[in-house]
Amino acid sequence: ADEKXVVIGLAADSG
């Protein structure tokens, strides 16, 4: 989820 970046929380979960 690096595309967003904003959603760092979800990004970490997604990997």
Curated annotation (Swiss-Prot):
GO annotations under biological process? reductive pentose-phosphate cycle
Under which pathway is this protein filed?
Answer: Carbohydrate biosynthesis; Calvin cycle
Reactions mediated catalytically: D-ribulose 5-phosphate + ATP = D-ribulose 1,5-bisphosphate + ADP + H(+)
- Annotated keywords: ATP-binding, Calvin cycle, Kinase, Nucleotide-binding, Transferase
Main EC class the enzyme belongs to: transferase
Q: Which GO terms describe its molecular function?
A: ATP binding; phosphoribulokinase activity
- EC number(s) stated in the UniProt entry for this protein: 2.7.1.19
Family named by the database record: Belongs to the phosphoribulokinase family.
Quote the subunit structure annotation.
Heterodimer of a 40 kDa and a 41 kDa subunit.
Report what the protein is called.
Phosphoribulokinase, 41 kDa subunit
Q: Which organism is it from?
A: Selenastrum minutum
